[in-house]
Each structure stands twice: as C-alpha cells, then as structure tokens.
Amino acid sequence: WIEKETGIPVLGILPWLKEIFPPEDSLDLLERKQVNQIAEIEIAIIKLPRISNFSDLDPFFSESSIQIKWIEPDQDLGKPDVLIIPGSKQTIKDLEILNKTGMSTQIKAYAKNGGNIFGICGGLQMLGKSLKDPHEKESSNELGSYLYMGLNLLPIKTTFGEIKRTKQKEEIASWPEVANVKGFEMHYGESDLINKTNSDIISLFKNSSIGWVHQKKDKSFIGGTYLHGIFEND
C-alpha cells in the first residue's frame, strides 16, 4: 500500500521493538512514566519545551536502582539526588523559559545547597556564564541582544558559530574514573573555560575540551558535556 500510494519502493516494514529502537523525542517523552518502588537514587530531569536527543536519557529507565522524575519549568524542583538539564533544539529560548518561570533560581539554590547537576549539550551551555549568538542560530534578536547570561554555575562561555559540529567520538574519560567512552557531538556552540588555570574545574575527557566538572569540597558536583550517548557507556 505504501509503495502504491507514495511511489517510493518499499522492501518491507520493521515493527517497533521496545528497548531496541530509540523512540521519538517528544512523543515518547509524554508517554514515559516510571514508578520504581525500590529505587535508591532519584534523578530529576528538566522537561525543557524544546528538549532534544531524548535517547541520551534512555539508559536510566532500564536501571532498577533509579527513579526518574520529570520536572516542568514551573514546578517545584524538590531535592533529587541528581538534576539533569538535557539538550535543547533552541538553547537560549529554553534558558529564557527557565528564567521566566523561576526555575533558574531554584537550580541555583539547589546547587548552593550541595545539589549534583549535569548538563548535556544545550544543558551544558545553560550552566555556563554566558552564551553569545551573533548568527542567530539558537535565538533571534527579538529578545534584544546577541549576548545572554547563563546560570553561571560553571566558568565557561559559549559562542554559537555558523557551522554545526556533527562527529562520532571516542574519548578517554577522566572523571569520575578513567574509562573509554563513545558518543557523538551535534551542536553549533563552542564552549571554553573562562580561566584555563582554574584548578577546581576538571576536564571530563583527557584529549578534548567537550566537557567539564566542578567537584566541590562537599563531594557534590556540577558538570556537563557535549557528548551525546555518554550514559550508554557502562
């Protein structure tokens, strides 16, 4: 029927097999509800309006020791063990939503009180001090500027270029332990440490600057990476 109606040659149809094929970003996000009575760790994930690369979070749903809690930007954050800020199709606009709803204030308070935070791609960019978008790749000048303030929880600055970086990566992780990891990059922004001599900030990978973490004295951490698929390495 498909070939007849569309004129496109069809060899066959593959059924969707749960836990084998990755789900669609937005549709699956609305359907997933996890109730884990024996969970030891609660991970809260900010449900950004323009969330992307939802498959980054798939590994957590198969862990019996983890309870996932989705947090809308206008909801109470609570006190999760870890907070994840995922990727976004439009980082700056989603950052504006966090500011308008007061979620950014909650995140900063959570960090100040010893909360653990990890950002993926756009989430990493939001954690930084500033985001500059001169080519309007992630924003538009209707917001009034090409320079936007981040959450200022990591001492990094991000500039969005004209070319989107898409690359498969194999890296050697240096935190929390040395390990070989695989994943991919897919982003416009390039981030740099504001002070490269800051000994409190650890590069997540030995050979490239695509992720950093601040391991604080109270053992809590704030970090992030551009590497999608990082949690599939275990």
Language-model regions, residue ranges each:
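C-terminal and late-domain segments of enzyme folds
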Residues: 58, 67-69, 73, 167-234
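Phosphate-binding active sites in nucleotide-utilizing proteins
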Residues: 42-45, 49-122, 126
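G-domain G4 guanine-recognition motif of GTPases
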Residues: 13-21, 46-50, 188, 226-227
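Cysteine-nucleophile active-site neighborhood
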Residues: 88-182
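Beta-strand->loop->alpha-helix junctions that form or flank phosphate-binding loops
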Residues: 9-18, 69-74, 157
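Short helix/loop capping segments that flank catalytic or ligand/cofactor-binding pockets
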Residues: 22-23, 53-55, 93-94, 128, ...
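Short, structured coil segments at secondary-structure junctions
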Residues: 6-8, 64, 147-149
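Internal gly/pro-rich beta-alpha loop/helix module
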Residues: 1-40
